[in-house]
Amino acid sequence: MMISEKPLGVEESIRQDLEVLTVSRRLVKSVSQKLKKKIHKTEVVEDEEIARGAVNCLSISVGCRVADTGEDFEDSSNKRWSSASEEGKGLMTICGTEETRLDCFSYGVRERFWKKNNRKYLADSGQDYRKHVYLPDDILEMCLMRLPLTSLLNAHLVCKKWQSMANTQRFLQMRREGSFQTPWLFLFAALKDGCSSGDIHGYDVSQDKWHRIETDLLKGRFMYSVTSIHEEIYIVGGRSMDRNSFKSHRGILVFSPSIKAWRKIASMRHARSLPIVGATEVTSEFSTMQTKQNRQDRRFHLSRVGGESDVYEDPHRLSVRRQNRNSADQNGTKSHRLIRQKLDRLNRNSSKRFVLIAIGGTGLFDEPLDSGEIYDSATNTWSEMQRLPMGFGVVSCGIICNGIFYAYSENDKLSGYDIERGFWITIQTSPIPPRVHEFYPKLVSCNHRLFMLSVSWCDEGDGQIGRRNKAVRKLWELDLVYLTWTEVSVHPDAPMDWNATYVSDQNILMGIEMFKIFGQVLSFFTVCDVLTEEASWRHVSRNQRSQKLNLSCTNKTIALLHL
């Protein structure tokens, strides 16, 4: 009996212990749930306080809560309570020497204090802060807008965002209107080792520094002409070596130096080498179809003078001609309507409309051309223009001035093409500036004035010994009202380069001369201000590009842009 009662007592004690243990688990679970609710409520309150911003403890009328550093930073026995708490009523908590080490915070700043002293959190937040440091787009755009061209091109390499921002039409327009651009001179068709290298040499006038732009599109291509408008350079025509023969080009290449981009536009109707080219802006009412009709009507009336009447000709030929004429008029009307519709649609999308003119040059078989073509940027098409006047001769130079394309021939004749009305005008000038025929003259338009540079022998009676052995380059101006030439100035350098090229920038004339002497290629860059009374020339740059060129650039050409 004693043996059986002992196990029963043991089992009873074990069951009681289990019941106590069960109660303890329930108590723990209940306490845990209450603790979670309290923590969640505290976090919500802290978030609300942070959203409202930190409140200065001195501005609270009911007192402040002293920060409880908690078990993370101090021992729990050193916990401090503010005068506003229930446990601290009647106690002075901000006096006494032992309270000097305790800081007073706004309620809900304990988490901030912990973040401030946690090294790992500071390291992570510092990295995140550095990742999100950036300038607003408008301020970044203003900074990029004021950079010089070389620095702006380097900024393109920073990221895709900067590159896309600096290539938009809005950015280029704001840069242009803000007068942040500087003049750049681009030299084409430089010869090296007996052939065209294809490189483009850009000269920053403001910095007096040359830059080389490598490209494979112009390698081996020569005898082309260039012109510039709207921050772009147009390379027109030219030739290249095709195995054992020469190939003439009709295509047009467009180079944008500000973004280092190339593109193509519609090709000319005829292949041309060394054509005389020019570009100018036109109004939205300009139409190449209208100028073509005006030329046909003008030719038609001129051809009928002194001729027979249509009534007395062969009736069959008369009917066929009238039928062809009516069909041509109908086709012309339809094509004109289509072009006008396309023109109106493109004018809404385009900013500024311009035309590109190419006249003269040599054809496929080196024959001189007296025809011309005009390109309309709105329709991206070329159309024939009226031929040069009879007996005009081979065109040697040309320039656009005040809406007139002036062309000068090897026979010392001057003609002007009215771009808006579409016909040539023969201009009789006096006296004709004397010149040495081995040196071609150059027409330049500067500040709505027409100039010509030509090489002539020294005048008699100037005291020079052997005057027939000395040639000078003179600058002449044409009076557009009285059509008379007047000598303006004399270039200080001897005319060693027979293909010296000149461009203008407002009232400044710029010229580049390159020639080979004693086995060395020399280059000179000179400028002239035509607004001054003396109109004197001065040297700007010497022998900077000629060091890497071993041949004189007989076919060189230049273009000026503001970038």
Curated annotation (Swiss-Prot):
Kelch repeats lie at residues 184-231, 232-282, 355-402. GO terms for biological process: regulation of cell growth; regulation of cell size. The keyword Nucleus does not apply. GO terms for cellular component: SCF ubiquitin ligase complex. Residues 129-175 form the F-box domain. It comes from the Eukaryota. Keywords: Kelch repeat, Repeat. SMART domains: FBOX (SM00256), Kelch (SM00612). This is F-box/kelch-repeat protein At5g42350.
